[in-house]
Amino acid sequence: MGARSSVLSGKKTDELEKVRLRPGGKKRYCLKHIIWAVNELDRFGLAESLLESKEGCHKILTVLAPLVPTGSENLKSLFNTVCVIYCLHAEEKVKDTEEAKKIAQRHLAADTEKMPATSRPTAPPSGGNYPVQQIAGNYVHMPLSPRTLNAWVKLVEEKKFGAEVVPGFQALSEGCTPYDINQMLNCVGDHQAAMQIIREIINEEAADWDQQHPIPGPLPAGQLRDPRGSDIAGTTSTVEEQIQWMYRAQNPVPVGNIYRRWIQIGLQKCVRMYNPTNILDIKQGPKEPFQSYVDRFYKSLRAEQTDPAVKNWMTQTLLIQNANPDCKLVLKGLGMNPTLEEMLTACQGIGGPGQKARLMAEALKEALTPAPIPFAAAQQKAGKRGTVTCWNCGKVGHTAKQCRAPRRQGCWKCGKQGHIMSKCPERQAGFLGLGPWGKKPRNFPMTQVPQGVTPSAPPMDPAEGMTPRGATPSAPPADPAVEMLKSYMKMGRQQRESRERPYKEVTEDLLHLNSLFGEDQ
């Protein structure tokens, strides 16, 4: 720790501890920031001794400055720390990191202007971003810039082999040789399972290439051989051979484009592995906006490796079929084959807060609105409500509970004592008659035979079918079922009277209050 913190002298260390990390902040720089900066320099292949002088810090800033706009947070923090150390070596008084950055950038710009025009870094000409450039009539290989490699690694880490990785690889690997493509693949640290899938695809495609392009035979001395599958993959060929195959005058072989196509096949398999959702399973939720559903649908469609005609059919059929019922009702009203713009415009407000508010208002209105009563039913209810009859005195206008007349004793139906109206024996019999002891009736009807009445018609003779005139008609035979019913009813009446006799008098006294008030009621 002592050796690493010795990049600054004691006086400069005191000055470092006075510099604030942020303008107006409380935290200040200390020795642990110097130690962290030394460890970060090792990752960029820079020696820690460069921090001991102003010129060394200038070299570090020259390397880091182009990477700051697209760099990570650690890179930006390292650049800020080196700017502060640079200002301390240059004996510039700074209060915080922002002042140190401004002074360091001003010095870098001044040093760039002092450089001669021939050695000053300039932007490459049109097409200069390609790894292979033509200089003085010769094709020269230029290594990939760290910015390109950083963009590729960030794409893989952020998208996690989503559908965007394939077009991103196509854009970043344009014009690359197999050597450059292998360099891009080697930069991917994580996702080694996906890298292994890509290697297997490369081996399969290389074997197919060797079968389709056999070796023609011995070649004359000095003639360039034709590329094999391993040569296209960059394992058995050099960069110079790859450039010659790509740009020779006779029978050029675009080994870079062929290798890119193999990598794209492997990336497409990785996309399907990392995104197992089938497009048939993409359905709109009941409250999901239509635009969000369309975004998910086309993202899944982009990952599908099918024919364009099949994708067109999926767009025209599944997009409307898998929408929720509200959007589907609107989309079917647009006619045949509506455009995507028309569908988005028509379903713009469905599923949003506006539609929810309208549905809530309609439901609340229906709940608060009373159900209409028909006019005839209302009149009938009003007529019934006006004709209230008292069971005690028989008058109209009040109920038995409100009646002031003396309470009528006995049955309210027949007026007899000893029973109540619900147990009145003179109540009307049903279709199957009255059952014994107040239970349900039996499965035979009860026939009432009047006593003392002589039939007007003579009985029929079963043999002749008619009774002779002048003969006295005999009484009809007694029905055993009627006799059994009568006996059951008599037995039931006796049992009810025996059960009600102990508390009959107490019940009548409680009903009429004769024991308390006597005749004054």
From Swiss-Prot:
Q: Which GO terms describe its cellular component?
A: host cell nucleus; host cell plasma membrane; host multivesicular body; membrane; viral nucleocapsid; virion membrane
PROSITE patterns from the UniProt entry: ZF_CCHC
- Place the motif Nuclear export signal on the sequence: 16-22
Q: Where is the composition biased (Basic and acidic residues)?
A: 105-114
From the UniProt entry, list the residue stretches annotated as the region Dimerization/Multimerization of capsid protein p24: 274-360
Region annotation (Interaction with membrane phosphatidylinositol 4,5-bisphosphate and RNA) maps to 14-33
Region: PPIA/CYPA-binding loop; residue ranges are: 214-221
- The name under which this protein is listed is Gag polyprotein
Please name the gene that encodes this protein. Answer: gag
